[in-house]
Amino acid sequence: MKRIPFIHLMAVTMVWLIAFNVVPALGPRAAEVQTRAEAGQNADAEFQAMLARVDGAQLELQNGRPAAFKALWSRRDDITLSGGFGGTIEKGWEQINRRLDWVGTQFSKGTNTIERVVANASGDLGYVVQIEHLRFHVPGQAAESRRDYRVTMVFRRESEGWRIVHRQADSQMTKQPAQ
């Protein structure tokens, strides 16, 4: 039989007693933990609100209006965009701003359905992985176009609130064998 060190046994017992409120947690450390937990809940609510704004702004973008989506991006030099239309990876606000203006010219009469795979935030960083199903018209064309994207976005909390710092999208929705 494996022997458990006495100090380890005491620590586990205290955690259990506090967790099940048999004995209240004592001292300022308990207050710090509670404050951090409450802050995490607020951050989660703020992050979820940001995701809702992103969803609405993307719909605007898919209708040829990029301003709302652009407003959600950080203006720092370390941001990146690897867009679903292919091409180079854009870096920094100046390049991303131009790219998003161009993307806005590619869409009209758009709708989307977003399947969130996972969304999480911790501290000042957050991320979302999702599948986006887009239906839109290319301006000047009558036929409806369809695109399905696998998307990863990274967010950072800045002085203005949560901001997008990276977006990657691709249309590789089926497994591709090595060739």
Language-model-detected regions and their locations in the chain:
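Bacterial N-terminal signal peptides
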Residues: 9-24
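A short acidic/glycine-rich loop-to-helix N-cap element
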Residues: 139-146, 174-179
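Generic short beta-strand segments
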Residues: 130-137
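Short, low-complexity N-terminal intrinsically disordered segments enriched in polar/charged residues
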Residues: 20-75, 124, 176-179
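Short beta-strand edge/turn micro-motifs at domain boundaries
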Residues: 2, 23-34, 127, 148-175
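A solvent-exposed, acidic/Ser-Thr-rich amphipathic alpha-helical stretch
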Residues: 44, 48-49, 66-122, 131, ...
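N-terminal secretory signal peptides that target proteins for export/translocation
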Residues: 1-7
